[in-house]
Each structure stands twice: as structure tokens, then as C-alpha cells.
């Protein structure tokens, strides 16, 4: 197995009902958002770091407006109660990120290149790595960054595209794996943001946020 096999499997899915579900999800990502909704997406991505997307979504929904109003201590207690693995750190990151609420939209629109915007997010938002910053950007409508999480790494291992699963992803390694996904993107005619949903489906049988 290798890149050719993965390309073929993606193309098969592209011709199935899964394509409709994925295209609908991509349209949802492109909708206009308020400043509060942008922050909510950012918090979702902070919650999913070293955690699961499903768990992050469940906790975000349970927190409600608490992401805007709770003190760091209250937020940490609530996150612990809801079962997050790193309640104190995530509470710290969320409270720290609140300062971005009034300026995040302007920061996003000031960048023409989404890769440079991703670099800015990684450097300036505590708790965001390349995976989380890419996830945030895809979820607000950007299409040319890859969300490389353990599901994607497992999939690339299964297809023999990666020889071993990296324990951690440095910037250089992240960009190297992203370049492999760019090749698959070119060959399938599917942008990176959408490709992530196809790969997630192949690995998990689900189309997630």
C-alpha cells in the first residue's frame, strides 16, 4: 500500500454519498461568524489539543457562556468535572485568549496567506500548535492547511506512507507530512481542508467537526 492506494480510496469516496456530507460540512465552515463565535471556535481547538475532537465538542457545549464569564479557577474546576485531561492548563489558555475577542477578526483579515496566519496563531496564542491552529483555520473557512492529528498519522502508517508514527510533531516534521497531504490533494482535486474530512472518514467512519 502507498499514496496511490490512498488516492484511489479517496476518489472512491468522492463518488459516494459521503461527498455530499463533506461538502455540506465545508459550507458550514464558510459561514459568517460573530466575534463570540470566532472565539468559540478557538476555544474548541484549544480544548482538543492532546484530547479528542468529540470530547472537546462535548465540553465546549457543556461550558456554554462559561468560556466568556468564568474565572480561571472556576473554569479549571468545571473542566475537571467534565473530564478534560488538562483542566488547569486549558483554563489558563482560554482565559488568556479572551483578550483576542475584539481583535481576532481584524488579525485574521490582515493576512493574505493562511500559512503565515497559522504561524502568527502558533506564536501568539498560548496552547495552539500547528495542528490546533490548522483546525481553527479550517473550521472558519480556510482550505489550504492540514490538520495532522493522531487519526491522520495512524492512517498514513496503515497505508505505508509513514514508516513510523512520530511521538511529537516539530514544525519541520509537520510541514513535511503536510507536503505529502498536498500531493494527495493535488491528485484528488480536493483542497486540504476537505481532504482532512475524507481521511478522517476513512480512518473513523465519521465526518466530524
Swiss-Prot record:
The keyword Ribonucleoprotein does not apply. Its EC number is 3.2.2.-, 4.2.99.18. GO terms for biological process: base-excision repair. The keyword Hydrolase applies. The active site is at 131, 149. SUPFAM superfamilies: DNA-glycosylase (SSF48150). Keywords: DNA damage, DNA repair, Glycosidase, Hydrolase, Lyase, Multifunctional enzyme. The record marks 209 as: Important for guanine/8-oxoguanine distinction. It catalyses: 2'-deoxyribonucleotide-(2'-deoxyribose 5'-phosphate)-2'-deoxyribonucleotide-DNA = a 3'-end 2'-deoxyribonucleotide-(2,3-dehydro-2,3-deoxyribose 5'-phosphate)-DNA + a 5'-end 5'-phospho-2'-deoxyribonucleoside-DNA + H(+). One of its GO terms (molecular function) is class I DNA-(apurinic or apyrimidinic site) endonuclease activity. Pfam families: Ogg-HhH. Catalyzes the excision of an oxidatively damaged form of guanine (7,8-dihydro-8-oxoguanine = 8-oxoG) from DNA. Also cleaves the DNA backbone at apurinic/apyrimidinic sites (AP sites). NCBIfam families: PRK01229.1 (NF002305). Belongs to the type-2 OGG1 family. This is 8-oxoguanine DNA glycosylase/AP lyase. It comes from Korarchaeum cryptofilum (strain OPF8).
Amino acid at each position: 500500500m502507498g499514496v496511490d492506494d490512498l488516492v484511489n480510496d479517496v476518489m472512491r469516496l468522492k463518488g459516494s454519498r459521503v461527498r455530499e456530507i463533506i461538502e455540506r460540512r465545508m459550507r458550514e465552515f464558510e459561514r459568517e461568524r460573530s466575534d463570540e463565535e470566532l472565539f468559540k471556535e478557538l476555544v474548541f481547538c484549544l480544548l482538543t489539543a492532546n484530547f479528542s475532537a468529540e470530547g472537546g465538542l462535548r465540553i465546549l457545549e457543556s461550558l456554554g457562556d462559561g468560556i466568556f464569564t468564568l474565572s480561571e479557577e472556576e473554569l479549571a474546576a468545571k473542566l475537571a468535572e467534565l473530564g478534560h485531561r488538562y483542566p488547569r492548563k486549558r483554563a489558563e489558555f482560554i482565559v488568556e485568549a479572551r483578550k483576542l475577542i475584539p481583535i481576532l477578526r481584524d488579525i485574521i483579515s490582515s493576512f493574505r496567506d493562511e500559512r503565515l496566519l497559522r504561524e502568527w496563531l502558533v506564536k501568539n496564542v498560548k496552547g495552539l500548535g500547528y495542528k490546533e491552529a490548522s483546525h481553527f483555520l479550517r473550521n472558519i473557512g480556510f482550505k489550504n492547511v492540514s490538520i495532522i492529528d493522531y487519526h491522520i498519522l495512524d492512517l498514513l502508517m496503515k497505508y505505508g506512507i509513514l514508516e513510523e508514527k512520530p511521538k511529537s510533531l516539530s514544525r519541520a516534521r509537520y510541514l513535511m507530512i503536510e507536503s505529502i497531504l498536498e500531493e494527495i490533494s493535488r491528485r484528488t482535486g480536493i483542497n486540504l481542508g476537505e481532504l482532512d474530512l475524507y481521511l478522517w472518514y476513512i480512518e473513523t467512519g465519521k465526518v466530524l467537526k
